[in-house]
């Protein structure tokens, strides 16, 4: 029993000891847990401070890098960099950039909603030049032993105006006209006679009811007549001829009017204007060889394309030098053209900016190309170019050829053998260009010379075929600023500025008007349309206004080229002396064509 109690006490003691041990271990474990938690708290606080320190250091480094990037200059632009920049500009169309690549010229002319090759209004107008019942025929009014001789002046087309006006002057003076003499001594140095360029028989026969015309001056009782040589002022009207030339003609029987170009006023009575048209558009035709060769050139252009443009391009060194225009060629251009300009000792010092601002500078080949593209003509269009020597040669023509690769001339579509009968004579070569330009679907010019004016009038008379003359006064600023705008903006402005310069019917002629350019008296309208007087809106240029415009707005067609280098201006005053006893030099269109 005692042994059992003893064992029971030992068991109870053992249990108590294990319990105390567990309690002690629990305390130790709790303490270790508290210690671990405390250590974790300490470590978290330490880590936060480290991260704060690292963040502060990183922020300082970022600030330093930003300051460095702002204050350091940009790297030098390389060609590769600029090329990449331009490609970005092309994609985003950044208008503010001044780089040329912003001004992208399309290859297509676009769809402008109008017909490029004709006018939809032309069918309502037609040429009409028949004489009225009041117009006396030649057999009733021509006086016997009264002969008028004419010496023309300038290039082919300037001489053409003289021939046309000579017929009218003969009618005014009731005189017999002797076939006019062509100019063999001007800048062009062409020895061709009238019969070698124009059809004499047709000229005489078709005008037989209007004016008596002889090929040669007849002899006076077996002796040769001695004509009185005279010179009349520019724009001389009917009264001028009747009061100043007719008395001399009655006394001497034969009068020769020299330097006869633009010697007849634009303002004549309607029957005289219609006579001008009968001469120009029906009687004055080229010889058969010229017409046949011209027909061959036209057929070859038609074989290349259904429609084609004819461009009369005047950009000769002499003409540019005289005009005083500057085209950006630097000292080389100034030196070369300046040396040529010294031929004319009386020329004043040029102001290129003023000349161009007034619209007196011919457009460059590139500018003509840009204008045509803006008007809707794409790169697939074929162009026949009538031109002389182009200043700068192929380098000057390159931009135009890039815009219109289908670039032709009589030299490229005809052989040397075919052109041989004409190539030694500037007048006959000019006649070939005249024929092709006249038959083209669209005629374009970069100048306001004689050929441009003559053909503009002819194309109006025969159906108002499109004839594009650049509005140089407006376009010059546009060409200067073209790199500061998009192509669409440029093209829109070109089309706006060219309104009234496209050869459309009812165009109001801006500024002065040459009758040969706008033969309004010879253009009639179909029934149901307003009369020609009404369509002019009552605008009429008086004699005084005409004279003022001639003096205030001269161009190179009013310039006299003299072998001695002298130049003089003749005032267009109908009261100036008719005769020129001392042979003083006067105006002649050196830059006539």
Predicted regions and their residues:
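N-terminal targeting/anchoring "stem" of glycan-biosynthesis enzymes
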Residues: 2-593
């Amino acid at each position: 029993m005692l042994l059992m109690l003893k064992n029971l006490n030992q068991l109870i003691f053992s249990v108590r000891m294990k319990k105390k041990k567990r309690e002690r271990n629990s305390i130790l474990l709790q303490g270790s847990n508290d210690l671990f938690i405390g250590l974790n708290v300490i470590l978290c606080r330490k880590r936060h401070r480290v991260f704060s320190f690292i963040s502060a250091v990183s922020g300082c480094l970022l600030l330093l890098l930003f300051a460095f990037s702002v204050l350091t200059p940009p790297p030098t632009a390389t060609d590769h960099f600029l090329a990449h920049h331009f490609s970005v500009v092309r994609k985003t169309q950044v208008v503010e950039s001044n780089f040329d690549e912003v001004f992208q010229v399309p290859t297509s002319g676009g769809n402008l909603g109008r017909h490029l090759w004709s006018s939809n209004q032309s069918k309502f107008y037609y040429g009409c030049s028949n004489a009225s019942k009041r117009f006396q025929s030649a057999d009733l009014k021509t006086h016997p032993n009264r002969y008028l001789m004419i010496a023309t002046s300038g290039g082919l087309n300037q001489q053409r105006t003289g021939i046309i006006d000579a017929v009218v002057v003969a009618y005014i003076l009731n005189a017999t006209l002797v076939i006019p003499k062509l100019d063999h001594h001007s800048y062009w140095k062409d020895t061709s006679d009238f019969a070698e360029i124009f059809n004499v028989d047709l000229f005489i026969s078709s005008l037989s009811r209007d004016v008596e015309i002889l090929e040669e001056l007849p002899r006076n009782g077996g002796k040769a007549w001695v004509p009185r040589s005279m010179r009349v002022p520019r724009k001389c009207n009917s009264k001028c001829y009747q009061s100043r030339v007719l008395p001399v003609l009655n006394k001497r029987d034969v009068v020769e009017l020299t330097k006869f170009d633009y010697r007849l006023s634009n303002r004549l009575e309607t029957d005289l204007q219609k006579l001008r048209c009968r001469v120009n558009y029906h009687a004055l035709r080229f010889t058969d060889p010229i017409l046949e060769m011209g027909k061959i050139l036209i057929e070859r252009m038609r074989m290349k394309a259904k429609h084609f443009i004819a461009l009369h391009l005047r950009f000769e060194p002499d003409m540019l030098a005289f005009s005083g225009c500057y085209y950006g060629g630097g000292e080389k251009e100034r030196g070369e053209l300046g040396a040529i300009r010294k031929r004319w000792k009386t020329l004043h010092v040029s102001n290129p900016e003023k000349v161009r601002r007034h619209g007196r500078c011919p457009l460059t080949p590139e500018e003509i190309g840009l204008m045509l593209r803006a008007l809707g003509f794409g790169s697939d269009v074929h162009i026949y170019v009538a031109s002389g020597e182009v200043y700068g040669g192929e380098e000057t023509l390159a931009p135009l050829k890039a815009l219109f690769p289908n670039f032709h001339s009589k030299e490229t579509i005809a052989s040397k053998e075919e052109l041989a009968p004409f190539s030694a004579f500037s007048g006959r070569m000019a006649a070939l260009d005249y024929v092709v330009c006249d038959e083209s679907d669209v005629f374009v010019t970069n100048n306001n010379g004689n050929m441009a004016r003559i053909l503009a009038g002819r194309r109006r008379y025969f159906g108002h075929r499109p004839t594009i003359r650049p509005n140089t006064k407006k376009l010059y600023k546009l060409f200067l600023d073209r790199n500061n705008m998009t192509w669409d903006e440029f093209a829109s402005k070109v089309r706006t500025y060219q309104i009234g310069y496209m050869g459309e019917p009812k165009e109001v002629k801006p500024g002065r008007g040459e009758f040969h350019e706008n033969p309004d008296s010879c253009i009639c309208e179909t029934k149901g349309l307003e009369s020609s007087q009404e369509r002019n809106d009552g605008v009429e240029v008086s004699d005084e206004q005409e004279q003022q415009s001639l003096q205030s707005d001269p161009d190179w067609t009013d310039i006299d080229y003299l072998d001695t280098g002298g130049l003089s201006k003749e005032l267009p005053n109908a009261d100036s002396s008719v005769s020129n006893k001392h042979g003083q030099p006067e105006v002649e269109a050196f830059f006539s064509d």
